[in-house]
């Protein structure tokens, strides 16, 4: 696992608190009766990224920024002002500007959807990337139900693409405060 995905916690108390929060999520969440929940060891609990436990609104922001980063190679070609305005509404003006300025990763951009489908594009792409960044099935089982549902055909993004995108998205949302829509 990449060091950037392990919670940046230096003291044992914080690490134990993180593991306990993950354990509560496993025991109380939708994964409680799943076989994956019974095979997770205490040491593994600390490997779940912190974003999986964030409040729903913060997690949704990460998801949409991640989806926008994934779609950015195609977005840079947009000339439709309506589509750009919808993207601004979904992730914020400053965030959109930063997404557009981020160096492009060598990925094929998703097809350009009609303007009304941008939320679905950002949500589905963000979900695929976030889930693709997770190493283990139990992690995807914890994170999956807390993310907006996607088309069943949407597969997780390959880890080599997903991890850098999630790292960029985490850096962006840490630098830019939540913007009013």
What spans do the regions from the language model cover?
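General marker for long, soluble alpha-helical cores
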Residues: 1-181
């Amino acid at each position: 696992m990449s060091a950037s995905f392990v919670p940046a916690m230096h003291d044992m108390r914080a690490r134990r608190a993180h593991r306990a929060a993950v354990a509560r999520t496993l025991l109380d969440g939708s994964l409680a009766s799943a076989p994956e929940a019974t095979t997770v060891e205490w040491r593994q609990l600390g490997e779940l990224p912190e974003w999986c436990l964030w409040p729903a609104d913060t997690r949704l922001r990460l998801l949409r920024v991640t989806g926008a980063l994934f779609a950015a190679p195609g977005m840079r070609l947009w000339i439709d002002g309506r589509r750009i305005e919808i993207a601004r509404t979904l992730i914020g003006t400053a965030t959109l500007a930063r997404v557009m300025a981020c160096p492009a990763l060598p990925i094929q951009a998703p097809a350009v959807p009609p303007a009304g489908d941008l939320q679905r594009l950002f949500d589905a792409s963000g979900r695929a990337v976030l889930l693709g960044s997770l190493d283990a099935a139990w992690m995807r089982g914890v994170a999956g139900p807390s993310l907006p549902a996607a088309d069943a055909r949407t597969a997780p993004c390959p880890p080599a693409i997903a991890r850098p995108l999630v790292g960029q998205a985490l850096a962006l949302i840490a630098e830019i405060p939540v913007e009013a829509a």
